[in-house]
């Protein structure tokens, strides 16, 4: 019974093959079923699904104009690391009598597969990386990227960059880049990353390149490896503005770019699949409806470009056999397919016809125009070039063999600008008086109405000119923006722009070189410089003799010597000039009848001193020079005193009515030379960066002190720095922008002041992300506001109109006020001293006179004992003359 059953099965099998053979040779020897092979490696699950689905689409959508043939497939999975597995898989396909093989290869399996194909004349259609080797029977579905990469390197003018390549695919491109580098004098650092298994090694490579100040990377790897590298880029914070990554891969939309996009780095890539192609859209519509149990990674995973190449490979195979069928080429296999390991190898006779037909195919697929050269390489194809911006990816142009790279016009940029009108722009800023402050009733308000200040008004005016909607966002860390020297990550408002969390920064943000490298600035809306803030010193009490301050000590000494000199000269010329002498009156009785009278002279030494003093005090006296020489002396002395007194009076008003404050510091040089007063800056900002980078000796000395000072002289916020100045009792100076310094001087308690000039010159600018479409519009708005004078009006409004220290009170070290007793106390002291001296001299004169009179009376009494007493009038006259001679008052006439 079993034998009969077995014989029945053998008969049925024989009948089946007989019918199949008759059907297979019904059209001039062309089979009705074309068997193709499939070789798939690991990580090609979706490609395997796309392969089977493409065959299914062809078999269910036949061209009715020709007698249809069906595609049949045989699939083997190979382990590329095992050469025996590769050989066994290929021989399995060859022994089945397949007409062509579709499959993948890598660097290890490529030589084995291409050798078998060449020896056995079996065509191998592959979407794997293209090779420059002139191999036969290999149809390369993937276009070469070498020309496109070189075109973009020239377009972006890269002269210094890093080339990270996969060992399996990068040698041909590496050779082309190195040849171009020699011709164009490029600096290229090439690193192979194909054999790296540890992700930490990627991180070490990126850190090493960053230490070399490398900002541009060309990454030539498969999608999975690119995703791994970009993940490390994000972790290290190297995806900020200023970095540019060119991804040498045809699946730009397959790469995970969401995290990198928000960092602000510029990313350029290539895309072979045009998602706007109706064929692509139709395929995807069917693709997403597939049962994922039958077609893994079809429904919930995006279509890879390698899957699209797989679909197109089936189109190419089908089109080639259509051509062979139309040409009535006999491609049928008769008998056994043979042994692939035979020595010598026995090639398939029809294999050359199939290879020729495959190379002659020209069809439109999901990857565009599909056409091959004589070596089976893609030709006459177009690759789209994409750029990743903060707002997303956009098509930047295209590349083909004839036109090379063709960038798109700025229409896309204008569209971005137009779209900004329809969305709310995020404006990052910082709480800093008077730029941005909370209103007193801010808790009852919402949105932008909660804030007030210079930058709030400026943002409103800019938005009005640019015609955008915006919302103010206070930066979370309260910092302006600096890059961490270790992690290289930007903080503050600059970080908000760099990492895509804000669109504009309207704040007192200084325009610096390091910031300009990662963000764009408008023209300055305010000019300023670094200045020194100290606590306002106590008003110096005027000295007792402050009335002497209008003239220097040297001038007073010269006046004293001039006074003495003029008096002596006047005395001498009066003695020498005969016109200063005159006879006594005839009515005057001579003192001694026996001696001739002496002609008197009014300008003795004491009278000369008295005359000079009276003229200097502008009071005059009873005597005046009579001679020409004496009058010349008096005239020049009067002229001298006129100028001196006028100058003194003019300065006296200012010195007595102005309270002066003595500042211990007047400049940065004063700070650098001393050690008693500490000084510092904001911990994160352009002021600190200025001192860190400065090459001026004074500033280098100051930076050396600041970075090593204990406790730290750096403050987290400006308010902390101001508070430290106020509490330090004059022992701390704060270095900050001059505009902020001037503003704080105008605020109560009015105890700070700006000293010295500005240390540098710079400006505040409105910042936008690198390459932002808003940059030009914002820049024009700032220029227009400046020309209209609105920027000056805003500064006056928030600095001086709302000042709390009086007009100019915080701006000047000198303050005019009413005179106090201390200002003129010295004058009263001199008055009291003069009165006291006069009383004392009078007392001395009285005592002296009394004593002299007593002696005279005794002498007279003794004389009377020897002589008769003289007449009374004669005695009185003699007494008077004696008294006169005692005092020597020659100017009195008797």
UniProtKB/Swiss-Prot annotation:
Domain of life of the organism encoding this protein: Eukaryota
N-terminal signal peptide: 1-28
Glycosylation, residue list: 63, 266, 380, 415, 422
Pfam family, one: ANF_receptor
GO CC annotation: AMPA glutamate receptor complex; dendritic spine; endocytic vesicle membrane; parallel fiber to Purkinje cell synapse; plasma membrane; postsynaptic density membrane; postsynaptic membrane
GO biological-process terms attached to the record: glutamate receptor signaling pathway; long-term synaptic potentiation; modulation of chemical synaptic transmission; protein heterotetramerization; protein homotetramerization; synaptic transmission, glutamatergic
Modified residues (Phosphotyrosine): 877, 887
Protein's name according to its UniProt entry: Glutamate receptor 3
Gene assigned in the entry: GRIA3
């Amino acid at each position: 019974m079993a034998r009969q059953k077995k014989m029945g099965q053998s008969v049925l099998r024989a009948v089946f093959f007989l019918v199949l053979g008759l059907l297979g040779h019904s059209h001039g020897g062309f089979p009705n079923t074309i068997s193709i092979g499939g070789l798939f490696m690991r990580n090609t699950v979706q490609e395997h699904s796309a392969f089977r689905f493409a065959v299914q689409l062809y078999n269910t959508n036949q061209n009715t104009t020709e007698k249809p043939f069906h595609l049949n497939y045989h699939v083997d999975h190979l382990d590329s690391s095992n050469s025996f597995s590769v050989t066994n898989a290929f021989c399995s396909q060859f022994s089945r009598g397949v007409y062509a093989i579709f499959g993948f290869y890598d660097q290890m399996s490529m030589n084995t597969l291409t050798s078998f194909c060449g020896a056995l004349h079996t065509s191998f259609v592959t979407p794997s990386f293209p090779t420059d080797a002139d191999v036969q029977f290999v149809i390369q579905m993937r276009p070469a990227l070498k020309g496109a990469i070189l075109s973009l390197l020239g377009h972006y003018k890269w002269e210094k960059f890093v080339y990270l390549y996969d060992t399996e695919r990068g040698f041909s491109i590496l050779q082309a880049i190195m040849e171009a580098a020699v011709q164009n004098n490029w600096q290229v650092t090439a690193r192979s990353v194909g054999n790296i298994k540890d992700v930490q090694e990627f991180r070490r490579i990126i850190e090493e390149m960053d230490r070399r100040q490398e900002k541009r990377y060309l990454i030539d790897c498969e999608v999975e490896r690119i995703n791994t590298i970009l993940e490390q880029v994000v972790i290290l914070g190297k995806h900020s503005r200023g970095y540019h990554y060119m991804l040498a891969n045809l699946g730009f939309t397959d790469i995970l770019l969401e995290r990198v996009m928000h960092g602000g780095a510029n990313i350029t890539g290539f895309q072979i699949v045009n998602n706007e192609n109706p064929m692509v859209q139709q395929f995807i519509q069917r693709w997403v409806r597939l049962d994922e149990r039958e077609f893994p990674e079809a429904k919930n995973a995006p279509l890879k470009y390698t899957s699209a190449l797989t679909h197109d490979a089936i189109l190419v195979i089908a089109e080639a056999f259509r051509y062979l069928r139309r040409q009535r080429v006999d491609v049928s296999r008769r008998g056994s397919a043979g042994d692939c390991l035979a020595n010598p190898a026995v090639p398939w006779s029809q294999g050359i016809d199939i290879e020729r037909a495959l190379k002659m195919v020209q069809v439109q697929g999901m990857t565009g125009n599909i056409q091959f050269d004589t070596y089976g390489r893609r030709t006459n194809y177009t690759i789209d070039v994409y750029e990743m911006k903060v707002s997303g990816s956009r098509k930047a142009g295209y590349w083909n063999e004839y036109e090379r790279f063709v960038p798109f016009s700025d229409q896309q940029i204008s569209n971005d600008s137009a779209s900004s009108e329809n969305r709310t722009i995020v404006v990052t800023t910082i709480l800093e008086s008077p730029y941005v402050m909370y209103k007193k009733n801010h808790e009852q308000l919402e949105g932008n109405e909660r804030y007030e200040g210079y930058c709030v008004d400026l943002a409103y005016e800019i938005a009005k000119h640019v015609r955008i909607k915006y919302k103010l966002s206070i930066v979370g860390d309260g910092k302006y923006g600096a890059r961490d020297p270790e992690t290289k990550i930007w903080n503050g408002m600059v970080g908000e722009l760099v990492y895509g969390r804000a669109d504009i920064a309207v704040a007192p943000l200084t325009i610096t070189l390091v910031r300009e490298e990662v963000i764009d600035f408008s023209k300055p809306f305010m000019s300023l410089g670094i200045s020194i803030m100290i606590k306002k010193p106590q008003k110096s009490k005027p000295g007792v003799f402050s009335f002497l301050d209008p003239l220097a000590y040297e001038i007073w000494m010269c006046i004293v010597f001039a006074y003495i000199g003029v008096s002596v000269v006047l005395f001498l010329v009066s003695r020498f000039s005969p016109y200063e002498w005159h006879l006594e009156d005839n009515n005057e009785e001579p003192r001694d009848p026996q001696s001739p009278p002496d002609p008197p002279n009014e300008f003795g030494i004491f009278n000369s001193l008295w005359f000079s003093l009276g003229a200097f005090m502008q009071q005059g006296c009873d005597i005046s020079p009579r001679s020409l020489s004496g009058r010349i002396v008096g005239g020049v002395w009067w002229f001298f005193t006129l100028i001196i007194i006028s100058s003194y009076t003019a300065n006296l008003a200012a010195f007595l009515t102005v309270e002066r404050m003595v500042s211990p510091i007047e400049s940065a040089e004063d700070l650098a030379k001393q050690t008693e007063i500490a000084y510092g800056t904001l911990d994160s900002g352009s002021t600190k960066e200025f001192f860190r980078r400065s090459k001026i000796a004074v500033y280098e000395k100051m930076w050396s002190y600041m970075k090593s000072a204990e406790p730290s002289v750096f403050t987290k916020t400006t308010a902390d720095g101001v508070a430290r100045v106020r509490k330090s009792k004059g022992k701390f100076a704060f270095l900050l922008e001059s505009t902020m310094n001037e503003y704080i001087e105008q605020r109560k308690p009015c105890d700070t002041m700006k000293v010295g000039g500005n240390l540098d010159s710079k400006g505040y600018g409105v910042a936008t992300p690198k390459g932002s479409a808003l940059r030009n519009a914002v820049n024009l708005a700032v220029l227009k506001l400046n020309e209209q004078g609105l920027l000056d009006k805003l500064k006056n409004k928030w600095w001086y109109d709302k000042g709390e220290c009086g007009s100019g009170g915080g701006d000047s070290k000198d303050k005019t006020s009413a005179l106090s007793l201390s200002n003129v106390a010295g004058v009263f002291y001199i008055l009291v001293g003069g009165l006291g001296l006069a009383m004392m001299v009078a007392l001395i004169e009285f005592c002296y006179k009394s004593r002299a009179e007593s002696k005279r009376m005794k002498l007279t009494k003794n004389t009377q004992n020897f002589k008769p007493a003289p007449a009374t009038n004669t005695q009185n006259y003699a007494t008077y003359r004696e008294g006169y001679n005692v005092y020597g008052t020659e100017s009195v006439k008797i």
